[in-house]
Amino acid sequence: MSITHQPANLTLAQIQQMIGGVMLLSQHSPLHRRYVVAEWLQRILPAFELNQFCYYEDEHGRPIAFCNWAFVSEQIRDELLSGVREISPSDWRSGQQIYIPEMIAPFGHGREVVNDLRRRVFLPWQGQKVCTVRGKVDAQNDRCIRKVQWFSI
C-alpha cells in the first residue's frame, strides 16, 4: 500500500486551536498531564505537519478526543514497542506498519475513535494489525507502566 501525503488545508489558527484542544484533553488524562514540552513536540506536532491525525469535538465545539498515527518500518515499530527509544521525526513515514503514538480520549470515546479510524481513515489497510503502547500511571511508585496493545483494522 502506497502512502501519499495529503496536506490538510488548515490555517495556522486552526492548528493552534486543535493543539490547545489536545492540551485541554491532556488535563483529564493522568498520563498526559505528566508530559513535558519536549514529549509533546516529539509525539504530537509531526502528526499535524503530515496530516496523520484525527481531532474530535462534541456538538458544542469542545474537544473530546485526539488520535495520531505513524507509518513505521518493522524495525522501528519493534524498537518503539520494546521501549528502546521514542519516536523521532524521521520515523513517521519510514514504512508500512501503523503505529499509534497517541490516543487521548479521557471522556470514554476511545472505542468510537477506533471505529471511526477503521471506517474512515484505515479502510485501505483493513485486516492489518495496528499497535500502540499504552501508559498507566502508577502514582504510588511515581512511574508509568507500559502496555503494548494490538488491534486489527
Curated annotation (Swiss-Prot):
Catalytic machinery residues: 32
Disruption phenotype annotation: Cells lacking RtxC do not show reduced toxicity. However, the RtxA toxin displays reduced actin cross-linking activity.
Keywords: Acyltransferase, Cytolysis, Cytoplasm, Transferase
Cytoplasm is among the record's keywords: yes
Compartments where found: Cytoplasm
Catalyzed reaction equations: a fatty acyl-[ACP] + L-lysyl-[protein] = N(6)-(fatty acyl)-L-lysyl-[protein] + holo-[ACP] + H(+)
Keyword Transmembrane attributed: no
EC number annotated for this UniProt entry: 2.3.1.-
InterPro entries named in the record: RTX_toxin-activating_protC_bac
A Gene Ontology cellular-component term: cytoplasm
EC top class named in words: transferase
GO biological process: killing of cells of another organism; toxin metabolic process
GO molecular function: acyltransferase activity
Protein purpose: Catalyzes fatty acylation of the protoxin (RtxA) at internal lysine residues, thereby converting it to the active toxin.
Assigned protein family: Belongs to the RTX toxin acyltransferase family.
Protein name listed in UniProt: Lysine-acyltransferase RtxC
Origin species: Vibrio cholerae serotype O1 (strain ATCC 39315 / El Tor Inaba N16961)
This protein's encoding gene: rtxC
